[in-house]
């Protein structure tokens, strides 16, 4: 497994884990009541920060332990990274579009914030999955 493939795996796990933890915290705090009544800001910001910190720490540990992590990016890594980021963009666009529509409809800020976070999470998960699939199966040549 190349260093970039390891980074893609770490990114995928961190993004997905943080988002699922956030959703679980909000649902537990709602305890059957309306989710819009839950104080969601601290768990949302906290889950994002924890995801970033864990991702950085795990990548540092992987680089320290693994000899393959010191490899530089080659053309294949750059192509796969670009492919993954382009694949993930639709999630971000969908989340931002949904948030914009919700704002125009004057929906509760809870739903707007969660639409944005869902978009970011979808973008991260889709990009991570696309990169891992590309590393395993290769990219199609046209």
Which residues make up each language-model segment?
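Alpha-helical transmembrane segments
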Residues: 39-57, 115-122
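Alpha-helical transmembrane segments and their membrane-interface junctions
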Residues: 92-113
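Alpha-helical transmembrane segments of multipass membrane proteins
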Residues: 14, 18-22, 50-58, 95, ...
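Long, highly hydrophobic alpha-helical transmembrane signal-anchor segments
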Residues: 2-46
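Membrane-helix interface/capping segments
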Residues: 59-79
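Alpha-helical transmembrane segments and their immediate juxtamembrane interface regions
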Residues: 116-142
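Membrane interfacial helix-start motif at the N-side
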Residues: 1, 5, 76-89
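Loop-to-transmembrane-helix entry motif
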Residues: 44-48, 84-91
């Amino acid at each position: 497994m190349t260093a970039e493939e390891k980074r893609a795996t770490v990114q995928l796990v961190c993004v997905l884990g943080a988002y699922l933890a956030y959703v679980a915290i909000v649902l537990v705090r709602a305890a059957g009541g309306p989710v819009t009544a839950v104080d969601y800001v601290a768990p949302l910001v906290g889950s994002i920060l924890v995801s970033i910190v864990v991702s950085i720490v795990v990548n540092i540990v992987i680089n320290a332990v693994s000899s393959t992590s010191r490899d530089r990016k080659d053309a294949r890594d750059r192509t796969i990274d670009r492919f993954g980021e382009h694949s993930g963009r639709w999630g971000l666009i969908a989340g931002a579009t949904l948030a914009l529509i919700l704002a125009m409809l004057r929906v509760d800020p809870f739903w707007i914030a969660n639409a944005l976070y869902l978009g970011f999470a979808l973008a991260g998960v889709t990009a991570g999955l696309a990169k891992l699939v590309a590393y395993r199966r290769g990219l199609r040549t046209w």
